[in-house]
Every structure is written in C-alpha cells, then in structure tokens.
Amino acid sequence: MVTFLKRFNALLFGLLFSNCVFSQETTQVTLDGLDKPVEILKDHWGISHIYAETEHDLFFAQGYSAARDRLFQFEIWRAQATGTVAEILGSRAVDRDHGTRLFKFRGPMHEEMNHYHPRGVDIITSFVHGVNAYIDEALQDPDSLPLPFKLLDIQPKHWTEEVVISRHQGLLGNISLELSTGRAVCAIGEDKVRELRYFHPHDPILTLDPLIDCDSLLNNDILHLYNSYRRPIRFQPDDIALAQYRNTEEAYETIADILIEEERDLQKRSIDDIGSNNWVVSGDLTQDGWPMMINDPHRSQAVPSLRYWSHLVGPGWNVIGGGEPEIPGISIGHNEHGAWGLTVFNTDGEDLYVYETNPNNPSQYRYLGEWEEMRVISETIEVKDARSVSVELKYTRHGPVVFEDQENSLAYAIRPAWMEVGGSPYLASLRMDQATSWEEFREASNFSNIPGENMIWADRQGNIGWQAVGIAPIRRNFSGMVPV
C-alpha cells in the first residue's frame, strides 16, 4: 500500500499572546505528514495550545511542539530508552546501557500500544512522526541546535515507538527493599527483623528458601545492572567537547560533593516522611459549591523539568494539563467534564528470584527439578572514544538475569510486573483525557498499571472520587518481602 503524504501550511508557534492581547508574531511552517492545517498558540507561560482538525494531526503536532521546546531532553530520553548513552558519555555508561537493554520491553508492540488507548498505535505513531519532523527540521541547520548539542558534539537522532513506551523513567518498584530485607534476615534473623521494621500486612513470610546462600546474598552487588540504568544522568567536565566551556575539576567536585551530601541526608529520612499529596473536597463543603482539588506529585527536581504543560484540542479531545514532554496526552489535568490528579500508591510489583545454575552450563537453571535454558540475546554497545562492548542479555521464565554468582552456581533474576503489556508509566492517561464522568474515569484507570497510583477526580456535576490503581503479582506461597 502506498501512502500519499499531503502538504499543508501549519501555523506553528504563532499568535503569541500575553494577558489575552494578541501580538503580531506569527510563524508558518510547512510539514509533510499533516492531514489539514494545525494551529499552535503560545501563551505568555510558554504553554502550547494545539488546535487540530484530526486526531492524527493533534498528536503529530504535540510531538513536534514538545520536541521543539525540549529537543536536548528528548535526545537524552531517547538515549536512555534505547541503551545508547555510552555513545554520548563513553565507557562509564556501558553498564547503564547494559541494564537498559536487559529491561527493554520485548513483547507485542501492537498490543502494547493499544493497551493505553483503543487507537494507541495511531496516536503513539503520530506523536513519534511529529517528533521526527522537528528533528529533521533542526538538522537542516545543525548550527542552530541548542547549546548542549554543541557542548557534547552530538546531534539528535530519530525516535521510534519503542522510545515512547520505555519503562526507564517510572517509579517502578521496591526490589531494593526486598533485597535489603533478605540480607537483614541473613544477618540478624527473622524475629529481629520483625522487631525493627514495620510491615504491612504485619506478619509477612520472611523465611528464606534453603537454596539461598546468605554469603552470596550479602557480599555481591546483585542489583548493579538494575540500579545502573535507573540512575539519573550526570555530566562531567570531560564530557564537554569544547574544553573552554568545561568546569574546572575543583568546581565540579564542589558541586558533586553538595549533591552527594544532599542524597545522604535524604536517605537518612524515613520513607514515610517523603511523598506526594493530593486531596479533593466536595462542593458541599466549599463556599461556591464547586469541588476543590489540590494535587502535588513530588518528583526529583531536574533541568530541564520533568513536567511539561500542553492544551490539546481536536475531535473528541479538549484537555489541558501537565505530563512528561516525551509522552503523548496529558497525565494530570482537566477536560470540559472533570479534573484528575495522582500520587504514587505503593504496590509491590517486583520479585527477586534465586536459581541454582548448572556448574557445567551457567546458562541453564533448575526449575521444578529440571534444567531449563535461559533465553540469551547478544547485543553490541557502541562506546564514545572506545571500542564497542558485546553483552549477553539472559532471561529465565520469570525475567531478566541481573547477576550471576558462578562461584556458587547461582543466578539472580527480577520478575517485574512492569515488563508485561501495559507497563509504561502514565501512558494510560490517554484514556483518562477523554473521560466524561466518574464511571468513565474509573474504567480508564483500570488500564493504568505502573506505577501504582492514587487517582482523584472531581467533575462539573459535583462528583468527587478516589481510586487506587496498579498491578501486583499474585503470590500464592511467598510474601514478596524477601528473595525467593
């Protein structure tokens, strides 16, 4: 089948206005890929108000607009999602890329994208095409690329749908707590752990399987690959290609020491003292009779910001709010019918499995008394200013193998609920964006798997509501609080 791309004028980033007074600044851009003209108005807060006549054009324009505003952020996101950060930062990012590829979603993409919306394939594909349209436009004049590209001596690369559905950015689970609890049981015993740590439910199974070797559990960096790909990216002076723009090593160390000290201070705090908040009040209790909603989801401060505001107007869509710029739709916001917000609802969506491996073949693990072959994928990581690195990605029936203790013939794998279909954080907000009632909002929330969330709702009919959403494994014979 041959698809003919029509060319239309799109009024992009035009009609800048402030305090409802329109200026005369208008820019017209002609793009391949639009069905009809699209108009984007930039207000004095920098929010893009996108008006399109088709759904395809709406999300094409959202991708184009967000990439134009946050191009460097988009490139770093793409590199994180695809496991290609080492091409930018060199050898120190190899383990990050290894971990990213190990936890890459490798399931059915059509089913995956349509989980988030009945027309998810079309929406996500349109968004990606819009992102790439701006990248192509920017590459026509590389000298005009934002300064960070010049400092790092890189250029933006095209996106694919796999970048949008990446899991790398989400608040995913509690595998570190599970491992630390298992180590504590090894070190001081179950009874002492129960005495020192609060559990809910209050009496979980903490008995370790006899197969688990406490020396191995205590003395190995089992989650190194997992943690490597989850860490935020931090640049160093020698990442800067132009030496005259580098910080001195002394200045860099001063900044790094401050960040390290802040992280240590944060780690001293109880996890119960850290978190987001939201609340919603019935109109019966407000002065004007309308429901009142407050939502304050806490995330790490970063530059550029994790949040990005948009207003999307098209057939079946009229929604404004915030989200992550690299994701189509609006994660937190309101339409003509209601408003919604979210905070994290703690669910245990990860389990650490320990296997006996075959001393004669480390790629075999024992399951139900039989040796099973791990699935092995070989990949090559390209590295800036160094030779490429070949890695083996291993998988058991339960998930990615994160550590192999060949001396003790053991392998550790993580079973993450978020690697199943529907595990991309916040993308299911696409369904919420079109909800017209509390009932429709609850139905849409059923598709929001990761992270677990407290969803709140308030609508023009005066309804308010709270719904916990998320998925967690059904554990029939273990608690998930310690490795199994």
Regions found by a protein language model. Give the residues of each.
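Hydrophobic alpha-helical segments
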Residues: E350, F403, L410, S448-V484
